[in-house]
């Protein structure tokens, strides 16, 4: 059974294995053991209440409960940009016009921005390619909404998610090659590694401070602005169906889109509810997959179960209850895994 749980110190080697499979561009999951260990420690201290809000971040893993295999990772930053500035570009417009010459040009322009400062961030989503089946990707991504719904006071009103931009298998980023490299004088992979290992001072020191006309970039770079890596397209679709939208903010490195949503408008958060759980044999039928989570802050768990999402009394097997670390008579959080598709 696949289970979402908080990260543990013993997971570092498994996270290193996952990091080696990302193919680059996932800044928050570098293949650096010291950095990953520090990330785990920060998550543990967050759960223990030992960190200020500016440093808090939760990390979860997807585990096969039968074998102990860690198949994926996901995380939430509580409030970005309160310690180090959180940069992105806003894609806007500058108009150059002359009535005398009968010239009017509206030019797409990149403006350096810190507009998302203080927002909660969904980040570090990666599922081992060997485990991309049977709803694991949906479980991994959406489990975070169950945690946010249960512990709403821990998070801010706006949630953002940076999507990985277009990068090829050799680590080549058209956006970086045409823009970032001119200011940073290093390859994308080097800048990505420095950022991922916490060495972010160079961003503020070297970033261009003035607006940049996108027409000055290569056509290849212009074409990838706001576009996602092919492997990230499913993750983007998942978030958009939960209510997230692209509002013309992009990553300063690879040009990937930043999606955002008010936390209380996220479908899985808004529609999740608490129901009593009982032990037994679940009813047979053509039921949809649902997310089921306990309400235990320190021992949070999420699993998938096929059931009626409108039920008031959820029947789970002994194995499912054990995976959730809860008992009959307790209350669990329930929501349909995917939104019901509207038909004409």
Curated annotation (Swiss-Prot):
InterPro entries (UniProt xref): Acyl_CoA_acyltransferase (IPR016181), Arg_succinylTrfase_AstA/AruG (IPR007041), Arginine_N-succinylTrfase (IPR017650)
Alphabetically ordered keywords of this record: Acyltransferase, Arginine metabolism, Transferase
UniProt keyword annotation of Nucleotidyltransferase present: no
Residues binding succinyl-CoA: 125
Catalysed reaction, written as an equation: succinyl-CoA + L-arginine = N(2)-succinyl-L-arginine + CoA + H(+)
Top EC class for this record: transferase
Pathway stated in the Swiss-Prot or TrEMBL entry: Amino-acid degradation; L-arginine degradation via AST pathway; L-glutamate and succinate from L-arginine: step 1/5
A GO term, aspect molecular function: arginine N-succinyltransferase activity
Active-site residues, as the UniProt record annotates them: 229 (proton donor)
EC numbers: 2.3.1.109
Keyword hit for Transferase: yes
Primary role: Catalyzes the transfer of succinyl-CoA to arginine to produce N(2)-succinylarginine.
NCBIfam families to which the protein is assigned, alphabetical: arg_catab_AOST, arg_catab_AstA, PRK10456.1
Family from the record: Belongs to the arginine N-succinyltransferase family.
Name of this chain's protein: Arginine N-succinyltransferase
Source species: Shigella boydii serotype 18 (strain CDC 3083-94 / BS512)
Organism placement in taxonomy: Bacteria, Pseudomonadati, Pseudomonadota, Gammaproteobacteria, Enterobacterales
């Amino acid at each position: 059974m696949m289970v979402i749980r908080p990260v543990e110190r013993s997971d570092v080697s498994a996270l290193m294995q996952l990091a080696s499979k990302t193919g680059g561009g996932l800044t928050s999951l570098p293949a650096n053991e010291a950095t990953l260990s520090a990330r785990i420690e920060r998550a543990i201290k967050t759960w223990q209440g030992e960190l200020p809000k500016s440093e808090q971040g939760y990390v979860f893993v997807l585990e096969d409960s039968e074998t102990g295999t860690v198949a994926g990772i996901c995380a939430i930053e509580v409030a970005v940009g309160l310690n180090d500035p959180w940069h992105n570009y806003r894609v806007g417009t500058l108009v150059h016009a002359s009535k005398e010459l009968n010239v009017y040009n509206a030019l797409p322009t990149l403006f350096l921005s810190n507009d998302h400062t203080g927002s909660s961030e969904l980040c570090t989503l990666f599922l081992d390619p060997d485990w991309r089946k049977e709803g694991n990707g949906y479980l991994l991504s959406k489990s975070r909404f169950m945690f946010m719904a249960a512990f709403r006071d821990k998070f801010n009103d706006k949630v953002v998610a940076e999507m990985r931009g277009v990068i090829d298998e050799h680590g080549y980023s058209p956006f970086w090659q045409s823009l970032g490299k001119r200011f940073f004088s290093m390859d994308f992979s080097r800048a990505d590694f420095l950022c991922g290992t916490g060495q972010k001072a160079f961003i503020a020191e070297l970033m261009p401070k003035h607006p940049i006309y996108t027409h000055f970039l290569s056509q290849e770079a212009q074409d990838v602005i706001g576009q996602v890596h092919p492997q990230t397209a499913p993750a983007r679709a998942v978030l958009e169906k939960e209510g997230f939208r692209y509002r013309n903010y992009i990553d300063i490195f690879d040009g990937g889109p930043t999606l955002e949503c008010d936390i209380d408008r996220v479908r899985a958060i808004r529609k999740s509810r608490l129901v009593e759980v009982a032990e037994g044999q679940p009813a047979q039928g053509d039921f949809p997959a649902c997310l089921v989570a306990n309400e235990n802050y320190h021992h949070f768990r999420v699993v998938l179960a096929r059931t009626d999402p409108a039920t008031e009394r959820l029947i789970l097997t002994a194995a499912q209850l054990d995976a959730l670390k809860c008992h009959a008579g307790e209350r669990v959080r329930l929501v349909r895994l995917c939104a019901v598709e509207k038909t004409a």
